[in-house]
Amino acid sequence: MEDFQASEETAFVVDEVSSIVKEAIESAIGGNAYQHSKVNQWTTNVLEQTLSQLTKLGRPFKYIVTCVIMQKNGAGLHSASSCFWDSSTDGSCTVRWENKTMYCIVSTFGLSI
């Protein structure tokens, strides 16, 4: 049982991280319509809130968080990432959030210390 708890405390838990990211997006953007002039503020708020909440978990990780906000206008977006890490402890998750006027895509990487 102790081994399970120890591994739980040092593992990257995708569901937990996704929940934190979704809350940060809702808090920063909420029901707003896309406004180009607000995008820098929104991305900064999403990133700061996400990192703040992840840090409060007190887990032995370094975090990397990226945020893309784009207007819904029919344009496509393709991205990729590649990591060389220990898949038993490190992890990543991507959250895609949308409303009628925009997409917000947040990728979070957790690297065990």
Curated annotation (Swiss-Prot):
<keyword id="KW-0132">Cell division</keyword>
<keyword id="KW-0206">Cytoskeleton</keyword>
<dbReference type="GO" id="GO:0005794">
    <property type="term" value="C:Golgi apparatus"/>
</dbReference>
<keyword id="KW-0243">Dynein</keyword>
<dbReference type="Pfam" id="PF03645">
    <property type="entry name" value="Tctex-1"/>
</dbReference>
<keyword id="KW-0007">Acetylation</keyword>
<dbReference type="GO" id="GO:0031681">
    <property type="term" value="F:G-protein beta-subunit binding"/>
</dbReference>
<keyword id="KW-0597">Phosphoprotein</keyword>
<dbReference type="GO" id="GO:0001917">
    <property type="term" value="C:photoreceptor inner segment"/>
</dbReference>
<dbReference type="GO" id="GO:0030742">
    <property type="term" value="F:GTP-dependent protein binding"/>
</dbReference>
<dbReference type="GO" id="GO:0007399">
    <property type="term" value="P:nervous system development"/>
</dbReference>
<keyword id="KW-0131">Cell cycle</keyword>
<dbReference type="GO" id="GO:0051301">
    <property type="term" value="P:cell division"/>
</dbReference>
<dbReference type="GO" id="GO:0030426">
    <property type="term" value="C:growth cone"/>
</dbReference>
<keyword id="KW-0493">Microtubule</keyword>
<dbReference type="GO" id="GO:0005819">
    <property type="term" value="C:spindle"/>
</dbReference>
<keyword id="KW-0505">Motor protein</keyword>
<keyword id="KW-0813">Transport</keyword>
<dbReference type="GO" id="GO:0050768">
    <property type="term" value="P:negative regulation of neurogenesis"/>
</dbReference>
<dbReference type="GO" id="GO:0008277">
    <property type="term" value="P:regulation of G protein-coupled receptor signaling pathway"/>
</dbReference>
<comment type="subunit">
    <text>Homodimer. The cytoplasmic dynein 1 complex consists of two catalytic heavy chains (HCs) and a number of non-catalytic subunits presented by intermediate chains (ICs), light intermediate chains (LICs) and light chains (LCs); the composition seems to vary in respect to the IC, LIC and LC composition. The heavy chain homodimer serves as a scaffold for the probable homodimeric assembly of the respective non-catalytic subunits. The ICs and LICs bind directly to the HC dimer and the LCs assemble on the IC dimer. DYNLT1 and DYNLT3 compete for association with dynein IC (DYNC1I1 or DYNC1I2).</text>
</comment>
<dbReference type="GO" id="GO:0070373">
    <property type="term" value="P:negative regulation of ERK1 and ERK2 cascade"/>
</dbReference>
<dbReference type="InterPro" id="IPR038586">
    <property type="entry name" value="Tctex-1-like_sf"/>
</dbReference>
<protein>
    <recommendedName>
        <fullName>Dynein light chain Tctex-type 1</fullName>
    </recommendedName>
</protein>
<keyword id="KW-0333">Golgi apparatus</keyword>
<keyword id="KW-0498">Mitosis</keyword>
<keyword id="KW-0524">Neurogenesis</keyword>
<dbReference type="GO" id="GO:0043025">
    <property type="term" value="C:neuronal cell body"/>
</dbReference>
<comment type="function">
    <text>Acts as one of several non-catalytic accessory components of the cytoplasmic dynein 1 complex that are thought to be involved in linking dynein to cargos and to adapter proteins that regulate dynein function. Cytoplasmic dynein 1 acts as a motor for the intracellular retrograde motility of vesicles and organelles along microtubules. Binds to transport cargos and is involved in apical cargo transport such as rhodopsin-bearing vesicles in polarized epithelia. May also be a accessory component of axonemal dynein. Plays an important role in male germ cell development and function.</text>
</comment>
<dbReference type="GO" id="GO:0005868">
    <property type="term" value="C:cytoplasmic dynein complex"/>
</dbReference>
<dbReference type="GO" id="GO:0005874">
    <property type="term" value="C:microtubule"/>
</dbReference>
<dbReference type="GO" id="GO:0010976">
    <property type="term" value="P:positive regulation of neuron projection development"/>
</dbReference>
<dbReference type="GO" id="GO:0000132">
    <property type="term" value="P:establishment of mitotic spindle orientation"/>
</dbReference>
<dbReference type="InterPro" id="IPR005334">
    <property type="entry name" value="Tctex-1-like"/>
</dbReference>
<keyword id="KW-0963">Cytoplasm</keyword>
<comment type="function">
    <text>Plays a role in neuronal morphogenesis; the function is independent of cytoplasmic dynein and seems to be coupled to regulation of the actin cytoskeleton by enhancing Rac1 activity. The function in neurogenesis may be regulated by association with a G-protein beta-gamma dimer. May function as a receptor-independent activator of heterotrimeric G-protein signaling; the activation appears to be independent of a nucleotide exchange. Plays a role in regulating neurogenesis; inhibits the genesis of neurons from precursor cells during cortical development presumably by antagonizing ARHGEF2.</text>
</comment>
<dbReference type="GO" id="GO:0030286">
    <property type="term" value="C:dynein complex"/>
</dbReference>
<comment type="similarity">
    <text>Belongs to the dynein light chain Tctex-type family.</text>
</comment>
<feature type="modified residue" description="N-acetylmethionine">
    <location>
        <position position="1"/>
    </location>
</feature>
<feature type="region of interest" description="Interaction with GNB1">
    <location>
        <begin position="41"/>
        <end position="113"/>
    </location>
</feature>
